[in-house]
Amino acid sequence: MSPAAPVLAVDIGGTKVDAAVVTADGEVLRASVARRPTGRDTPREGIAANIRAAAVEALTAVPDVRVAAIGVGSAGPVDLPARSVSPLNLPQAAGLPIDEVLGGLVDGPISLALDGTCIALAEHWRGALVGAENAMAIVVSTGVGGGLILGGRPISGASGNAGHLGQTFVRTIDGDGVGDAVAATLEAVAAGPGSVAWARTQGWVGETGLDLAASYRAGDEVAVAAVRRSATAVGQAIAAAATLCDLEAVAIAGGFSHVADDYVARVAAAAAAASVHAYARRCRVVPSGLDGDGPLLGAAALALRT
């Protein structure tokens, strides 16, 4: 990143929107951090108002800081040509025009990207992917997202949704026989809600990802199987991505990636087992090098590239 003025970073998610002012060297100004709710049932006008309110709060908290640009990372899908977002968990916000929502707040450009692209940018800037020219970041949480860095640059694709790995299909074994193989999206199989739902069909009586983590630590057989099932699916998807894109490294982030201490190791083993070619097996699978500020750092990195 070249020297530049601070930027406003905005991260739009399915339950909340975060905003903060971030310096050119990656310092999130703590006084500026702001959060507002979004939510599936929130009206479109309310979502737009809360996005803008979070941005305004962040800016007004540091009135002496000159902000040069805005970077926005959003849950997908996004539409970069239309400059709009349509987060799957915010049906009321389909086609929300970002320039209208955030226009006029700063005297500078507004950059938009998929949240997965922003996470990849953040990992490449200050996290686990520093120095990797061809890499991917994957977030395993209530959903599964991802972003790509190829040739040292973020890849957006035609609409802005390159790297949206969660909606690709994987083949997972739910039992011991070939007849138990099913095809499903990576997100349905590997994300926290899907893993919890599957465990409950197997007789597990917990309710949340935190419950599943506790059961895993206690050695509960179903919880162990659910974690293994999730990690195997993520590993299969990584093997496909590494084969297609010749990746050097993949960073795993997201709350559900902490469901077990050995989750990333399980993903790495599954990726190696599913890779046909040696070059794909050489792809390193590593934990995220970021803290909870990762999405904001990614949105800031996006703005700083402008």
Question: What do the predicted segments below correspond to?
Answer:
Residues 1-69, 78-82, 100-110, 122-132, ...:
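ATP-binding/phosphotransfer module of carbohydrate and carboxylate kinases, centering on a glycine-rich
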Residues 11, 69-75, 113, 137-143, ...:
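Short beta-strand segments
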Residues 28, 84-85, 154-155:
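Hydrophobic "anchor" residues
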Residues 33-35, 89-90, 159-160, 170:
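Short clusters of small/polar residues that mark proteolytic maturation junctions
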Residues 76-78, 89, 116, 141, ...:
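Short, flexible active-site-adjacent loop segments at beta-strand->alpha-helix junctions, enriched
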Residues 83-95:
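A charged helix-plus-loop insertion that forms the helical arch/lid used to bind
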Residues 89-91, 111-117, 137-140, 286-293:
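Active-site nucleophile and cofactor-binding loops and adjacent substrate-binding regions
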Residues 132-189:
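Glycine-rich phosphate-binding loop of actin/hexokinase-like ATP-binding domains
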